[in-house]
Amino acid sequence: MQKILRVMIIIAMLITAYLLILAWRDDYADAPAVETTPNAATTVGGDIPSTTGAAGDIPAQTIPVDNGLATTTPAQDTNLISVTTDRYDLKINPEGGDIVYAALKQYDATLDSDEPFVLLENNSNRVYVAQSGLIGPNGIDTADGRASYRSAADSYTMKEGQQTLSVPLTYQQDGVTVTKTYTFTHGKYPIDVSYQIQNRSEQPWQGQMFAQLKRDDSKDPGMSDKGALSMATYLGGAWGTPDDPYNKLKFNKFSNDELNVASDEGWVGIVQHYFVSAWTPDNFTGQFFSRETGNDYFIGFNSQPVNIAANKQLTLDATLYAGPKVQSELKEVAVGLNQTVDYGLLWPISKILFAILDGIHKVLGNWGWSIIVLTILVKISLMWFSNKSYYSMAKMRSLAPRLAALKEEHGDDRMKMSQEMMSIYKEEKVNPMAGCLPILMQMPIFLALYWVLVESVELRHAPWILWIQDLSAMDPWFILPLLMGVSMYIQQQLNPQPTDPMQAKVMK
């Protein structure tokens, strides 16, 4: 029993040391968190990107606009437009046409709940919405208020067999008709957002599109049911371009004007555990930005300014992804968006392990058994190194009498004894450190596998057998850690004991 306790203490110390290193990196590797101050009131005007370059706004644009100082009160939830698809339950606010609620129907909020996981929402507990609009000299979204769209219906539902669902919103002002259309595709999370601007006036129309995510400083709701021993994962902004696919931008860096990048194929978003929301421009170059207003954080892009002549029209398009971090789907949206599944420094190994794990799952259909098979395959792949270790240990045992004789002969002269020992090792072609080789090879592989298990949304609420009904959560009864400790003790007893009495005592 004492031996088992020693093994478990060693394992606990190693795990604790690793967790402390990760916690130190999260707490001290970057600047301290931004000091939060209460908001006096929530305003619509503060949500609109300014083109004046004022403090707290996005960088100055090529077309200036006077946003004014007036603010308005957001529309009430009773006027929201409901949208139901095979993937989403959404609500759109006619004031601005923003998505203010998005529930993912294929993901439960908790393991024992039938309620869907809510990614976007706008209430007293959390503010996290996807906004877009038109700004500039003739823009319909200003600090004075958002455009109030009209809709042909209060609710839209994707029927069985229907491949796409369009939700058109219209707004008219001074001879200009703006049609903002959300297009949903069956079986997919990306949402197409288009602005068709028809200028029937006698004057040219000037403006630009913006798309952004607005989030407050509330915690990640996906981490609330993981327990006190769960590993904290990244919550913050991120962006990428084809030349620089994945970059993190913590909330406490949003107000530093660090994000000033233009791209026509990039993306910008907010990342949390298992889920991500991101905007990407489709047919124009977007100027990425981030900013902070009180407790609210904004990250998004502005389009280049456009000029629409009288009696002409133009369409601006963007794509919103709001869903799980499924790598195969993220790849189709934008380059580098799949890297929001963040495996850390060991990502090359992790990607290979996940590809193998995913392939095994397609055959077995159970993620738990797939993990076991993957672990066995990893052990088999390291068998050559283990055999080298066993061979070295056997050679060391055969050399034990000669080494003991050296110790008696040169016991007082450690330098001479070391030289003679190295000579024997060289003569017999033995590496005394070869016994550590399997451990050195296994550590990066199993650490990479650990991050695969932590980051893969496929394991969220995935059952295995018996009491293990969520592979993303720790064992509630700690049975698996106990079994691991027992197996390590048995494996230790099966290994040959060192011939040196002191080494044998240490290994007991």
Role assignments for model-derived ranges:
Residues L80-Q339:
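Soluble non-transmembrane domains of integral membrane proteins
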